[in-house]
Amino acid sequence: MARVTVEDCIDKVDNRFELVLLASHRARQISQGAQITIDRDNDKNPVVALREIADETLSPDDLKEDLIHSLQKHVEVDEPEQDAASIAEGQLTSGSQDEDEMPETVAFDQMSEEELLAGIEGLVPPEKSDDY
């Protein structure tokens, strides 16, 4: 069989850079023991990955999703949100707790924009040091 080139795969994945990312990810999967979907023909893993993409034995969208999942550090789990009625009910029942268990509320001073700007203008810049 002829060697796989980028031109064989560019019909399946439009962006060459994305093709390189997908093929390299698939080659890593193969080297980690993933099952290949075509005959190896004594080819190396990157060539096998490109041939799988060219022969459409793997979906580029599935590869892309798997690549994104492998790069994620924190995976969000979709959990059903509470409806407004149960939230309000929870607040009403929590209001009957002892006052000793309730945390103290923190009060903040309110400041207008003019007061904030006047305070910023009144700041003195620090003297230059050799730390920079």
From Swiss-Prot:
Pfam families: RNA_pol_Rpb6 (PF01192)
Annotated function: Promotes RNA polymerase assembly. Latches the N- and C-terminal regions of the beta' subunit thereby facilitating its interaction with the beta and alpha subunits.
Assigned protein family: Belongs to the RNA polymerase subunit omega family.
Transcription in keyword set: yes
EC number: 2.7.7.6
Region called Disordered, residue ranges: 76-105
GO BP of this protein: DNA-templated transcription
InterPro entries xref list: DNA-dir_RNA_pol_omega, Pol_omega/Rpo6/RPB6, RPB6/omega-like_sf
The keyword Thylakoid belongs to this UniProt entry's keyword annotation: no
Name of the protein this chain belongs to: DNA-directed RNA polymerase subunit omega
Database matches in NCBIfam families: rpoZ (TIGR00690)
SUPFAM superfamilies in UniProt: RPB6/omega subunit-like
Subunit record text: The RNAP catalytic core consists of 2 alpha, 1 beta, 1 beta' and 1 omega subunit. When a sigma factor is associated with the core the holoenzyme is formed, which can initiate transcription.
Reaction catalyzed: RNA(n) + a ribonucleoside 5'-triphosphate = RNA(n+1) + diphosphate
GO CC entries: DNA-directed RNA polymerase complex
Enzyme class: transferase
UniProt keyword annotations, A-Z: DNA-directed RNA polymerase, Nucleotidyltransferase, Transcription, Transferase
GO molecular function annotation: DNA binding; DNA-directed RNA polymerase activity
